[in-house]
């Protein structure tokens, strides 16, 4: 990635963490369809690798705005995809994809972070990885910790996430019939891939 700043990438990761951590409320639903978000999406589309994924997400959002009981339907999609058994779902946990659930805990310790007591999910939840990546990108922009140390931890986190993210995204595509979370996960996949290549 060349045109997005470390802070902008951090914001994208934080935003995605929020959307994958809990069902959207009315305020979030209004926000994702707002003019402000359209500007943000326009900025993201200035990065060629992200363009197609952002376009698809915008299409899903446009369809969402005319969906009857959009929030309730999206909540049902969230529940079906992320909270049910793994037979027809895309569980957002590293351990669901035969990955070491302790790896994220080690990465958090290395970053001087810990999970919040307010987040009632296991530490290997996708949102924790994304929050860590957001934190690391913000730290890169601040310059208070040596960039080499932050970048090393960022690469370790991206590598750990990449071990299971493609399968998670494939399952989102397979089981999300409406497609909002499938599009969101595709944007995440492309972002992580670009971030990983930007060594």
UniProtKB/Swiss-Prot annotation:
Main location group = cytoplasm
Q: Which UniProt keywords apply?
A: Chaperone, Cytoplasm
InterPro entries assigned = Chaperone_TorD (IPR023069), DMSO/NO3_reduct_chaperone (IPR020945), HscB_C_sf (IPR036386), TorD-like_sf (IPR036411), TorD/DmsD_chaperones (IPR050289)
Q: Where does the record say this protein resides?
A: Cytoplasm
**Which is one Gene Ontology cellular component term of this protein?**
cytoplasm
Q: Which GO terms describe its biological process?
A: protein complex oligomerization; protein folding; protein maturation
Supply one GO molecular-function term. identical protein binding
Q: Name one Pfam family in it.
A: Nitrate_red_del
Q: What does this protein do?
A: Involved in the biogenesis of TorA. Acts on TorA before the insertion of the molybdenum cofactor and, as a result, probably favors a conformation of the apoenzyme that is competent for acquiring the cofactor.
| Family classification | Belongs to the TorD/DmsD family. TorD subfamily.
Q: What is this protein called?
A: Chaperone protein TorD
Q: What organism is recorded for this protein?
A: Escherichia coli (strain K12)
At the highest ranks, the source species' classification is: Bacteria, Pseudomonadati, Pseudomonadota, Gammaproteobacteria, Enterobacterales
